[in-house]
Amino acid sequence: MSKKQTKDKANGAKATKTIALNKRARHEYHLEERYEAGLALQGWEVKAIRAGRANIVDGYAYVRSGEIYLIGAQITPLIQASTHTVPVERRDRKLLLHRAEIDKVLTRVEREGYTLVPTALYWSSNKVKLEIALAKGKQNHDKRDAAKDRDWQRDKQRVMRRHNRDA
């Protein structure tokens, strides 16, 4: 190990590596609070995630009997997946959060009409973590406004670059 890596670990820095992002969530929802949750995975799922075979775009989280589960997320098994279990790509996966966080999320989802959307899947010190966000759906006019604003920002940057280059 190099000196730099040793120094980073001594300072308590956590190495994170993104596995999958849900960019569609930012487009379709107003994202508010974000939470980091662990995932209860089987062995073949961890190997498949290491190989980069995870997709969280179609996934969402819901509360069932006081626990939060991720459904719709796809982890495609490797060809040499486990022989003693049948791999299911889109099974319900339990999310690991503190009880206080679960209770807080539960009240927001049930009373205020929020949805739990996965936004990122990443490694955090050899553990797979999922970032979930409390979200409210956007209307079509909100999406159009966001697109107009994005185009305006791009045009503004283009004009500023051209102006600075000419000056």
Curated annotation (Swiss-Prot):
Annotated family: Belongs to the SmpB family.
Chain spans, region Disordered: 139-167
Matches recorded under InterPro entries: SmpB, SsrA-bd_prot, SsrA-bd_prot_CS
Keywords for this protein: Cytoplasm, RNA-binding
Function: Required for rescue of stalled ribosomes mediated by trans-translation. Binds to transfer-messenger RNA (tmRNA), required for stable association of tmRNA with ribosomes. tmRNA and SmpB together mimic tRNA shape, replacing the anticodon stem-loop with SmpB. tmRNA is encoded by the ssrA gene; the 2 termini fold to resemble tRNA(Ala) and it encodes a 'tag peptide', a short internal open reading frame. During trans-translation Ala-aminoacylated tmRNA acts like a tRNA, entering the A-site of stalled ribosomes, displacing the stalled mRNA.
Top-level taxon of the source organism: Bacteria
Pfam hit, one: SmpB
Entry GO MF terms: RNA binding
Descriptive protein name: SsrA-binding protein
Record-linked CDD domains: SmpB
Organism this protein belongs to: Xanthomonas euvesicatoria pv. vesicatoria (strain 85-10)
Coiled coil segments of this chain: none
Principal localisation: cytoplasm
Claim: Nucleotidyltransferase is one of the keywords in the record: no
Species lineage: Bacteria, Pseudomonadati, Pseudomonadota, Gammaproteobacteria, Lysobacterales
Location within or outside the cell: Cytoplasm
Biased composition (Basic and acidic residues): 139-158
One cellular component (GO) term of this entry: cytosol
Record GO biological process: trans-translation
